[in-house]
UniProtKB/Swiss-Prot annotation:
Lineage, highest ranks first: Bacteria, Bacillati, Bacillota, Bacilli, Bacillales
Annotated organism of origin: Bacillus cereus (strain G9842)
Protein name: Small ribosomal subunit protein uS11
Annotated Gene Ontology cellular component terms: ribonucleoprotein complex; ribosome
A molecular function GO annotation: structural constituent of ribosome
Quaternary structure and interacting proteins, as annotated: Part of the 30S ribosomal subunit. Interacts with proteins S7 and S18. Binds to IF-3.
Key word RNA-binding present: yes
Family, per entry: Belongs to the universal ribosomal protein uS11 family.
Source domain of life: Bacteria
NCBIfam families (alphabetical): PRK05309.1, uS11_bact
InterPro entries (alphabetical): Ribosomal_uS11, Ribosomal_uS11_bac-type, Ribosomal_uS11_CS, Ribosomal_uS11_sf
Signal peptide: none
GO biological process annotation, one example: translation
Short name of any one Pfam family annotated for the protein: Ribosomal_S11
Amino acid sequence: MARKTNTRKKRVKKNIEAGIAHIRSTFNNTIVTLTDTHGNALSWSSAGALGFRGSRKSTPFAAQMAAEAAAKVAMEHGLKTLEVTVKGPGAGREAAIRALQAAGLEVTAIRDVTPVPHNGCRPPKRRRV
């Protein structure tokens, strides 16, 4: 029996001008997802996916690299303008936004959608270092 060759489907090039950048910045990692206006993902990247491990994952530089990688793939689909939604308290928030602008994408709006509890769950105890 002949063995099947492992062929990957070629990514279909979409022609999308405007989109949304979802930046999730936690204390441990930064995840950047670029979607069209309906929320269908065009590209994504994260500090961990780029090979940053441990404490280097949570740095602004790692967030910058993740944003650049996601922007590069999304611009191949024709993406030009972005609305940015930022969620979380992490270090890579501003760095990721600046990297998207530096990659050549026009940022039209920046929205902070960090969830704020109305006194929900008890937070973790304070660290003593």
